[in-house]
Each structure stands twice: as structure tokens, then as C-alpha cells.
């Protein structure tokens, strides 16, 4: 009898307690637009290189926002895809205000995550809790296609500031412009250890 009451109580909690979203989530959900996107659909952008960088210091390839505040209206997460050409690297960085998940669809990468370094392959999932240093280098023979998710917005604003829409001419950033963008978005990403 006691277990039957417990099961009923748990079910009632799940149905009544968890089914009700906090008012902020309800408001966000009302403003968000459901999306169904194919691989090539989304907001395509290209990173701007830093002026004076050598060609082999190239930034990662193009990326595409799929879901964020500007695409679908989500105010609680960022979901995007990015290509990492052979030899390219996502520099060592951390995100103070958000967890990050990266899923590598293919290829081979060397990952420095926190205090660990490991070689990973297509199908690997990387989880970087907020404030965890991460660096990803494509050490394979093919372009890596990756997917990343942030648990909170912020880094997407930095990415837009350091990139241009996919078909727009790419003009390098000066070192001063890059420094100003990084300072403005320090709440979202830090590229240099203190």
C-alpha cells in the first residue's frame, strides 16, 4: 500500500509539478519558433582572420548558427555547426558563463580539455563545463564537421563580432579590433590564461 501511494505521489508530482514551466521559460517558449533545418540551412558565417596572421595560422572554417536568439528565438541555448579544416585549430579558451558540448561527426582531433590531452575520432563527444580550458586541433587528413551547443547565449555574440555573413567579403580584423571584441565579450569567452 505504501509503495502504491509513493508511486501515485511521484506521478502526481511529475504531472503537476514538472509539467508547469517557470514563467520565464513559458514566455520564452511563446516567442520561440519551431524549426526544421536541413544540413545547409541556417545562418552561415565565416571567421575573419587576424591581420598579419600566417596562412597556416588560419582560423577554423565556416560555421552555421542553427538555433539561438536570432534563429528560432531561443534565449536559453546556442546550437551550431562548424568545419575545422585539416591542420586548423580552435585555440585554447574557456567559457565563464556556459557549459559547452562539442560532437565531432568525423575525422581525428587532438583535444586538450582541462588537464587532459587525448586523441579522439569521429563520433566523439566533448563536454567542457563552464570555466574549463579547451583546445581542439584537427590532426587528421579530412575536414572535421562538428556540432556545438552552449547552455546559455553569449558566445554567439562574440562569434558574430569576429565573423561576416557567408557571402560577404572577408576583411581581416586588426589586432586592436580583435582585442576590443575579446574585452567586450570576456563574460562569454576568454582566450588567454590570466
List the predicted regions and their residue ranges.
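Positively charged n-region of N-terminal signal peptides that target proteins for export
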Residues: 1-4
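Bacterial N-terminal signal peptides
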Residues: 8-19
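A short, N-terminal "cap"/entry segment at the start of jelly-roll beta-barrel domains
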Residues: 21-76, 164-194
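Conserved short histidine dyad/triad with adjacent acidic residue
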Residues: 63-68, 80-95
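Ligand-binding loop in jelly-roll beta-barrel domains
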Residues: 73-74, 110, 130-156
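Glycine- and acidic-residue-biased ligand/ion/polar-headgroup-sensing regions
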Residues: 97-109, 114
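Short acidic-glycine-tyrosine-enriched beta hairpin
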Residues: 115-131
Amino acid at each position: 500500500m505504501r509503495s502504491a501511494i509513493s508511486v501515485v505521489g511521484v506521478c502526481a508530482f511529475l504531472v503537476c509539478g514538472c509539467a508547469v514551466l517557470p514563467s520565464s521559460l513559458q514566455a520564452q517558449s511563446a516567442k520561440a519558433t519551431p524549426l526544421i533545418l536541413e544540413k545547409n540551412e541556417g545562418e552561415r558565417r565565416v571567421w575573419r582572420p587576424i591581420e598579419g596572421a600566417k596562412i597556416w595560422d588560419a582560423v577554423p572554417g565556416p560555421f552555421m548558427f542553427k538555433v539561438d536568439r536570432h534563429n528560432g528565438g531561443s534565449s536559453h541555448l546556442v546550437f551550431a555547426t562548424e568545419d575545422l579544416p585539416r591542420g586548423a585549430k580552435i585555440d585554447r579558451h574557456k567559457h565563464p558563463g556556459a557549459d559547452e558540448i562539442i560532437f565531432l561527426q568525423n575525422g581525428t582531433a587532438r583535444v586538450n580539455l582541462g588537464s587532459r590531452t587525448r586523441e579522439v575520432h569521429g563520433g566523439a563527444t566533448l563536454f567542457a563545463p563552464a570555466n574549463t580550458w579547451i583546445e581542439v586541433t584537427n590532426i587528421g587528413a579530412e575536414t572535421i564537421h562538428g556540432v556545438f551547443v552552449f547552455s546559455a547565449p553569449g558566445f554567439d555574440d562574440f562569434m558574430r563580432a569576429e565573423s561576416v555573413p557567408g557571402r560577404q567579403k572577408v576583411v581581416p580584423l586588426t589586432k586592436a579590433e580583435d582585442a576590443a571584441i575579446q574585452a567586450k565579450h570576456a563574460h562569454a569567452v576568454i582566450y588567454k590564461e590570466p
